[in-house]
Amino acid sequence: MNNKKKIVKIFFYDKILFFLLISLSIIGIIIVSSASISFGIRLHNDYFYFAKRNLLYFFLSFFLFFQIIRIPINQLEKYNKIALLINLFLLIIVFIIGNSINGAIRWIKIGFFSIQPSECSKLILFFYISDYIVKKNKELKNKLWGFLKPIIIMLIFVILLLMQPDLGNSLILFLTTLLLFFLAGINLWKCCFMFLFGLLTIFILIIFKPYRIRRILSFLDPWEDPFNSGYQLTQSLMALGRGKIIGTGLGNSIQKLEYLPEAYTDFIFSILGEELGYIGSIIILIMLFFVIFRIFLIGKNSFIQKKFFSGYFSFSVGIWISLQTIMNVGGVIGILPIKGLTLPFISYGGSSLITIFSAIAIVIRSDFELRINKYQAYLKQ
């Protein structure tokens, strides 16, 4: 009898989204294995050092995924404020005990692992905002403090991230919160005010940080200074150019031989394009599109069944993955400034992979509960 119940439960999970999730992660493991070889041998005397760690992160993410989808959404909601406070604490202590890499203080080292609290911030803040929109909807729309409270919390997170500095994740937090408020029916003038405030903040940050001005200028014309501010982008474009239509073949990248910095993290799409070509790159982007589409579909179905928390959270995850993909790929191909963001599911990074697996586990759990409710309603007819 228990086995039959398990089979019925498996039937109600979104198998397409799960298949896309696993497929993209396996592709990521393969590309990271190729892109990180020269870095592994130079830094750790092991060709597959980063590949093995990435595989470990995948199994850990997979384990957490299967733990989370077993927990009812209403139980997860109880812990959103505790999770918010813990994440806020980690974002503060990262400045005290964190490791600095390439001038950024984003990682807390615990044994063999490094935690990046800024990655966890996306999941935890969007969970909190989604819960707040549902439980405090009238206050949010009608009272000034009700509107300002989540804005202040979001701005605290954004400021702490900007201090690291982490402009990419700060933008994702800000823009996703803004779009969630718009989706919730918040007054258009309030949303416009938030947007203009964000633009003004970005403008001020660019003016007072010379390296950000150089990034903007190098994005506009990377070939003007190809060996300094434009180096990453020119090397990235060269990698994509070498790939042409069908690519040089898996493992045959030249740019990964330390010509392109961050080849296995932020710029992995360049190596993917070089080795798998235009066709391989498009296939990956199509798969990412369908992941986002399935998540938005779950969000829409949640609203139809009046499961508003699941709806807002699903949309927040879809917006987050959309923005992160656009910013990463846009930076790599030279149509947007480089933000230092990973490509979801593909880039090397334990915190990034674990966080995104956890977020999608909650989305799939939401969808599971919708399907169960629909099935039970059908049986009662």
Curated annotation (Swiss-Prot):
Topological type in the membrane: Multi-pass membrane protein
Q: Which keywords, in A-to-Z order, does the entry hold?
A: Cell cycle, Cell division, Cell inner membrane, Cell membrane, Cell shape, Cell wall biogenesis/degradation, Glycosyltransferase, Membrane, Peptidoglycan synthesis, Transferase, Transmembrane, Transmembrane helix
Catalysed reaction, written as an equation:
[GlcNAc-(1->4)-Mur2Ac(oyl-L-Ala-gamma-D-Glu-L-Lys-D-Ala-D-Ala)](n)-di-trans,octa-cis-undecaprenyl diphosphate + beta-D-GlcNAc-(1->4)-Mur2Ac(oyl-L-Ala-gamma-D-Glu-L-Lys-D-Ala-D-Ala)-di-trans,octa-cis-undecaprenyl diphosphate = [GlcNAc-(1->4)-Mur2Ac(oyl-L-Ala-gamma-D-Glu-L-Lys-D-Ala-D-Ala)](n+1)-di-trans,octa-cis-undecaprenyl diphosphate + di-trans,octa-cis-undecaprenyl diphosphate + H(+)
Location comes to: Cell inner membrane
Tell whether NADP is among the UniProt keywords: no
Molecular-function annotations in GO: lipid-linked peptidoglycan transporter activity; peptidoglycan glycosyltransferase activity
Q: What is its EC number?
A: 2.4.99.28
Q: Which residues cross the membrane?
A: 16-36, 54-74, 82-102, 110-130, 144-164, 167-187, 188-208, 279-299, 318-338, 344-364
Q: In which pathway does it act?
A: Cell wall biogenesis; peptidoglycan biosynthesis
- What is the main EC category here? transferase
Give Gene Ontology CC terms. cell division site; plasma membrane
All disulfide bonds of the chain are none
Q: Which residues lie on this side of the membrane: Cytoplasmic?
A: 1-15, 75-81, 131-143, 300-317, 365-381
Q: Which residues lie on this side of the membrane: Periplasmic?
A: 37-53, 103-109, 165-166, 209-278, 339-343
GO terms, biological process: cell wall organization; FtsZ-dependent cytokinesis; peptidoglycan biosynthetic process; regulation of cell shape
Give the source's domain of life in one word: Bacteria
Against Pfam families, the record matches this protein to: FTSW_RODA_SPOVE
Known function: Peptidoglycan polymerase that is essential for cell division.
Family, according to the entry, reads as follows:
Belongs to the SEDS family. FtsW subfamily.
Name of this chain's protein: Probable peptidoglycan glycosyltransferase FtsW
Species: Wigglesworthia glossinidia brevipalpis
